Amino acid sequence: MCGIVGYVGTDKSLEVLLGGLKRLEYRGYDSAGIAVIAPDGSLATAKRAGKLDVLTDELQQHPIPDGGTGIGHTRWATHGGPTDCNAHPHLGDDGRLAVIHNGIIENFATLRDELLAEEFTFESETDTEVAAVLLGREYRAAGSLSEAFQRVVSRLEGAFTLLALHQDQPHVVVGARRNSPLVIGLGEGENFLGSDVAAFVEHTQRALAIGQDQIVTITPEQVTVTDFAGAPVEVEPFDVAWDATAAEKGGWPSFMAKEIAEEPDAVANTLRGRAADGAVHIPELDALGDEFFLGIDQITIVACGTAAYAGLVGSYAIEKWARVPVTVELSHEFRYREPVISGGTLIVSISQSGETMDTLMAVKYAREAGAKAISVCNTQGATIPRESDAALYTHAGPEVAVASTKAFVGQIAALYLFGLSLARVRGTLSAAQQRDAVAELFAVPEKIRAVLESKDTIAQLAHWMSDTRSVLFLGRHVGYPIALEGALKLKELAYIHAEGFAAGELKHGPIALIEPGQPVFVVVPSPRWSDELHKKVVSNIQEIRARGARVIAIAEAGDAAVLPFADEVIRIPLAAPLFEPLLSVIPLQIFAMELAVAKGLDVDQPRNLAKSVTVE
């Protein structure tokens, strides 16, 4: 959620910090601030509530000296409102040190009372200032930033990433993480810290991901990682697979428009190198050995939001192909209901960032109960893959818009690959069936391109409906999670009421919502796959149309049965039915984006939302 940047190097810290925070805006925030060690050795800070532009305007009107060491932060409020005072950094040791923080310090009230009893004072409502004041006290006792920092983080409870600097040690930044992201960037004569690699990818693509309960100290020439007890830790470097230009708009009106246009490539890149001779072979999973998968007797997919809907789509395919029971659980509900877990349970987690706190906690809970774990993730160096037996990366590229589009189709494609790989190992599909499925799957990217060609028609529809106050979405089978995702996108981007339903539930309550003019999107299944299911959906369309609904059908090319009953029909190319979600979701994404644009809303940074939810 919060964005964090740290830098030690040459006298360009303002450039690095502000540029890094700009690339972390997608994480969601309501205030921003920086702290810099000035050339004269003093600590200079600036922070403001509001967007990053407010901070940059402040710096233009009231400049602070540049320097070679600094930390920067974008805040998503948890403790205390979005005010200048509550914005980070927070100061300690009489303004000689600065701290920034992502996460929640659960025992901050106890620590605050302890410090108040010693007559320390506080200016903000935040838990972060407690850490800053505590660090100032410990620094005075220890005389060393690293030693004081180690003492402080060992006392903190909760999930957090913490960065600090002190003017007495002007070429040092220290950081720590527990259940919250922190990545190191390795430069020449300079080093970086960030919530993710986007913070520093403009300057270096060489990175290190530190583990749980670890502390990092960076100077211009050195990076040191220890555990919370001070013992040295070896960390493996990795290379970021994309450069800074991939996280820029490149002439598009919004990141969301750009990322929707990139969906064919997102799917193609996820599939690339993972099939041979008509069968799926995923190197990351094959390395675990067949026995790992043959021992599975149930699969539980854990995820939140859009990722959970990707999991629902994937569950239909995995269960059909591999003949293993598959359930999909919301991560934040999973571990609180005492689920039945055994050594035969495989947990498949889905998280674009690999840092979603609820999903991370679900994976840890399942692992402690004896489950195996695989993660589907789009971000190198993330925490959840490191907590799993293996990671299946989607290679969708950086997704900057807060509401997910290309990561969603990448996740579905990855789950299809996993299902086909599992079926091959378990022998539940013939060689011919595997070849046919692989061929159909690898044909999807070009079919997505064909759907994108109808974007102008969909945009026109959205602009016509810009005063709509409520929209319903219906689907059956794999169309049901697409209906859920279509409704979520509209809520996220256009701030209007939208609900997704299984079409079979219509007569069990939701039909009461139908009134004249009510817009209803219907994801129509292919009649080539199940004529019975197709007829039922057409019947549902007739039922709502009879009550005055305005029906927008998403149907495959050549399906004439919907024409007499739909007000508008958006066509998608013919595809194997299980793969249709990768096509039918595209018009719904475009519609939600264009409706938000018609209302004059920010489609990249919707209100109140964060890209990566790193607190529970």
Swiss-Prot record:
GO terms for cellular component: cytosol. SUPFAM superfamilies: N-terminal nucleophile aminohydrolases (Ntn hydrolases), SIS domain. It catalyses: D-fructose 6-phosphate + L-glutamine = D-glucosamine 6-phosphate + L-glutamate. It is found in: Cytoplasm. Residues 288-428, 461-606 form the SIS domain. Its EC number is 2.6.1.16. One of its GO terms (molecular function) is glutamine-fructose-6-phosphate transaminase (isomerizing) activity. InterPro entries: GATase_2_dom, GFAT, GFAT_N, GlmS/AgaS_SIS, GlmS/FrlB_SIS, Ntn_hydrolases_N, SIS_dom, SIS_dom_sf. Pfam families: GATase_6, SIS. It is an enzyme of class 2 (transferase). Catalyzes the first step in hexosamine metabolism, converting fructose-6P into glucosamine-6P using glutamine as a nitrogen source. NCBIfam families: glmS (TIGR01135), PRK00331.1 (NF001484). This is Glutamine--fructose-6-phosphate aminotransferase [isomerizing]. It comes from Leifsonia xyli subsp. xyli (strain CTCB07). The lineage of its organism: Bacteria, Bacillati, Actinomycetota, Actinomycetes, Micrococcales.
